[in-house]
C-alpha cells in the first residue's frame, strides 16, 4: 500500500514539473511581446519603455497612453 501511495506522489510531482515548463515559456513570450511598439498611428505600447517602432522615443501622455516623438 505504501509503495502505491509513493508511486502516485512521485508521478504527481513529475507531472507538475512537466506541466510548469510550457507555462513559463508562455509567460516569457508575452513579456517579449510587451516590449514592442504598436505599428499604427506611431503610438507606443504602454509598457514599451523609451522605444518606438521607427527608432523614435516615446513620450508618456498618461499611464496608459504615450506617443512617439520625432
UniProtKB/Swiss-Prot annotation:
Tissue expression profile of the protein: Expressed by the venom gland.
UniProt xrefs under Pfam families: Toxin_7
Residues with Leucine amide modification: 69
Keywords, comma-separated and alphabetical: Amidation, Disulfide bond, Knottin, Neurotoxin, Secreted, Signal, Toxin
Keyword Cell membrane: no
Propeptide: 21-34
Subcellular location, principal: secreted
Signal sequence annotation: 1-20
GO terms under cellular component: extracellular region
Transmembrane portions of the chain: none
Protein localization: Secreted
Molecular function terms, GO-annotated: toxin activity
Cystine crosslinks: 37-53, 44-58, 52-68
Known function: Insect active toxin causing rapid but reversible paralysis in crickets. No activity shown in mammals. Does not show effect on mammalian voltage-gated calcium channels.
Record family assignment: Belongs to the neurotoxin 01 (U2-agtx) family.
Domain notes for this protein: The presence of a 'disulfide through disulfide knot' structurally defines this protein as a knottin.
Name this polypeptide is given: U2-agatoxin-Ao1j
